[in-house]
A protein has these predicted regions:
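Positively charged n-region of N-terminal signal peptides that target proteins for export
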Residues: 1-4
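Bacterial N-terminal signal peptides
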Residues: 7-17
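Generic detector of low-complexity/intrinsically disordered segments
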Residues: 16, 124-127, 150, 168, ...
Length: 534
C-alpha cells in the first residue's frame, strides 16, 4: 500500500470512529433509524433528569419489516433492560409505540422481542422469531387505560396508561415482560416467549410513529441495562391463562398467578373459564379478575381432566379424593369420573373402576368418553351419563389417551403411541375404523376439535420427550381439517411456550371457533419476578 493510501485509510477510519462517537448517547453506543423512514429520528439524553427523549418516524413496527428510531448497545447472554416509559402526548395514531427491545440485527426484518407501550393503552410482548417472519404478540392485561391494579406489598397502585415502568428480561431461551407504575417496581405479568438470539445482539429503546408522515416522541427515564448472573435462588412457578386467536396467533393474558393451575375449559356461552387448582375447580370471568371456587362437594382432589356438557347444564370431573383399590388389591386414591351441576353441588360417580380420566362429552350429552387403565393398559372407554357399564373402544398395545368427540358425534379423536411414538388418531364413535390422522417427527397429544368442526388443535412435544410432562418447550399446533374426509391437513404453529401437562389437556375452544384458551408456565428467579402477579 502506498503512503498516500495508508493515510487515506487512517483518515476514513478516524472519520467513522468520530461519527460513531457522535451518535453515542448516554449509556447507548449508537442510535439510528431502522428500516425505511421518511423523516429522520433522533435520540437525546438529559443527564440532569436521567431521561432519554426518542423521536421516531416509521409506518410500523410489526408484520415482516420494521421502521423506527432505535438507540442501542451490543450485549450478549442473559440481559435485562428497565425504564419508565411515557409518551410526550397521546395524539396521533393510537398504535404508535415506545419500546424496550432485544434485536438480533439492524435489518428491518430482523429477529427481535420487545415490550411495546401503545398510545391506546395496550402493552404487549411483541416478537419475530425468524428473520422475515410475521410479528406476533402476547398482550398484557394492563390495557384499556390502566384499569388493572397491581399489588406491591401492602399497597395497591393503578397503572397510568400514559406511561409505565417496563422491564424486558432475557433468561436463556426465553424473554419475559414485567410491568408496573412509573417509578415503582415492575412485576412479572405472565408474558413469556422463546426467542433465538445468538451471539451479540442489540439492546435498547425505540419509538415508531405508526404514521409515515409524522414524527412522534416518548421519554425513557431511569433506564437500566445489565447482564444477569445465574440465579442462586429456587425459581418461582407462574401459571398464566391465555387465549390465542387462530387467524392472527395473537395471544392475550387473562390471568396470571404465582401458583400452579391447569386445564381451562371455555364456557359454552363464552362468558367464563373453568380450571383446576389445589384440587378444586375455579371459575374466572372471560375478562379476568379474581377466580371463584366452584362447590364440588366431597370431590376435593379434582385433577386436570374436566369439561362442560354440550347443553352447559353439567360438569364432568375426574377426582382422586375417594379411596380405591388397585388391580393388585392395594389401597389407593386413583382417579374416578363424576358429573355434577354446572353451578356446583354433589358429584355423582359414574366409573366403577379406577383409574379413569374424563376427556369428552358426546354432542347429545348422553355419553362420556374417558381413559381407563385396565389390566395394565390405558385404553379408551365410553360410559352412559345416566349410569351403566363402561364400553372398551381400543385394544392396541401402548397408551391411548385424550378421547374427544367431533361436533357431529360421528368420530372420536384421540392420541396413541401404538406406532412407537405419540400421534393423533380417530375412530368412529363405536370404536371401529381406527385411522391415523397424520404422522410427523414430533410427539402429539390431546386433539381438540373446534365447535364448527373445521380445525383441530393439539399439543406437540419434541420427539425425545416421553409422556406428557410439565415444564417443557412445547407448541400448540393447528390443523385445518377440510371436512370429515380431512382433505386439507395443513398444520400451522399457534404458539410456542413453556408448558405441557396442564396446558391444554381438555376442550378449551371459544364457542365461535375463533380462539382457544390454554395455560403457559414460567420458572422465574425471584429477583426477576418482583411482587406476585394477581
Amino acid at each position: 500500500m502506498s503512503r498516500v493510501g495508508a493515510i487515506a485509510t487512517i483518515i476514513i477510519s478516524l472519520i467513522s470512529a468520530c461519527a460513531s462517537a457522535q451518535n453515542s448517547v448516554g449509556i447507548f453506543e449508537n442510535h439510528s433509524d431502522v428500516g425505511a423512514v421518511l423523516h429522520p429520528g433522533s435520540t437525546t439524553f438529559d443527564s440532569a433528569k436521567n431521561t432519554y427523549t426518542v423521536r421516531g418516524n416509521g409506518e410500523n413496527l410489526w408484520a415482516s419489516a420494521d421502521a423506527f428510531q432505535f438507540a442501542w448497545k451490543k450485549m450478549s447472554g442473559d440481559v435485562e433492560i428497565t425504564a419508565d416509559v411515557q409518551f410526550a402526548n397521546l395524539t396521533g395514531n393510537e398504535h404508535k409505540k415506545a419500546v424496550l427491545m432485544f434485536r438480533q440485527s439492524l435489518d428491518a426484518d430482523s429477529v427481535y422481542a420487545d415490550v411495546a407501550l401503545h398510545a391506546s393503552g395496550l402493552t404487549s410482548l411483541q416478537y419475530r422469531d425468524q428473520k422475515g417472519a410475521t410479528t406476533s404478540e402476547v398482550e398484557s392485561r394492563v390495557n384499556n387505560h390502566g384499569q388493572l391494579e397491581f399489588v406491591s406489598g401492602p399497597n395497591k397502585y393503578p397503572v397510568d396508561y400514559t406511561g409505565a415502568r417496563l422491564k424486558l428480561t432475557r433468561r436463556g431461551a426465553y424473554v419475559s415482560l414485567s410491568i408496573g407504575a412509573m417509578g415503582l417496581n415492575a412485576t412479572y405479568d405472565g408474558e413469556s416467549i422463546p426467542i433465538a438470539l445468538t451471539g451479540d445482539f442489540y439492546v435498547g429503546i425505540g419509538v415508531c410513529s405508526h404514521d409515515k408522515d409524522v414524527v412522534e416522541e416518548a421519554n425513557f427515564s431511569n433506564v437500566e441495562i445489565k447482564n444477569l448472573s445465574a440465579s442462586a435462588a429456587e425459581p418461582v412457578l407462574y401459571s398464566t391463562l391465555e387465549t390465542v386467536a387462530i387467524d392472527t396467533t395473537i395471544r392475550r393474558v387473562i390471568y396470571s398467578d404465582r401458583s400452579h393451575f391447569e386445564a381451562p375449559n371455555w364456557a359454552r356461552d363464552g362468558s367464563y373459564f373453568l380450571f383446576n387448582r389445589n384440587g378444586h375447580i375455579e371459575k374466572l370471568a372471560v375478562k379476568g379478575g379474581t377466580p371463584e371456587v366452584l362447590d364440588t362437594g366431597t370431590a376435593d382432589r379434582v385433577n386436570n381432566d374436566h369439561g362442560i356438557s354440550p347443553d352447559a347444564s353439567m360438569l364432568a370431573i375426574s377426582d382422586n379424593s375417594q379411596p380405591t383399590k388397585s388391580e393388585s388389591g392395594e389401597e389407593t386414591h386413583d382417579s374416578l369420573v363424576y358429573v355434577l351441576p354446572i353451578t356446583g353441588g354433589t358429584p355423582r360417580r359414574l366409573t366403577k373402576k379406577a383409574p379413569s380420566y374424563w376427556h369428552g362429552w358426546s354432542p347429545d350429552g348422553k355419553t362420556l368418553a374417558f381413559v381407563g387403565q385396565r389390566n395394565g393398559d390405558f385404553d379408551i372407554y365410553t360410559i352412559p351419563v345416566a349410569g351403566g357399564e363402561e364400553t372398551r373402544l381400543t385394544t392396541a398395545k401402548g397408551l391411548d389417551d385424550g378421547p374427544e368427540y367431533s361436533p357431529d358425534g360421528r368420530y372420536i379423536y384421540f392420541n396413541s403411541e401404538r406406532t412407537g411414538h405419540m400421534q393423533i388418531w380417530r375412530m368412529k364413535a363405536d370404536g371401529s375404523g381406527q385411522e391415523q390422522v397424520f404422522s410427523d417427527d414430533y410427539n402429539n397429544w390431546f386433539p381438540h376439535i373446534s365447535p364448527d368442526g373445521n380445525f383441530m388443535v393439539f399439543l406437540t412435544y419434541e420427539r425425545d420427550v416421553t409422556g406428557h410432562p410439565g415444564n417443557k418447550d412445547v407448541m400448540l399446533r393447528l390443523m385445518s381439517l377440510g371436512g370429515d374426509k380431512m382433505t386439507d391437513k395443513k398444520i400451522t404453529v399457534l404458539a410456542k411456550l413453556f408448558g405441557g401437562q396442564g396446558t391444554i389437556n381438555v376442550p378449551s375452544w371459544a364457542p365461535d371457533s375463533k380462539s382457544l384458551a390454554f395455560v403457559s408456565y414460567a420458572l422465574i428467579p425471584p429477583e426477576d419476578a418482583g411482587a406476585p402477579a394477581h
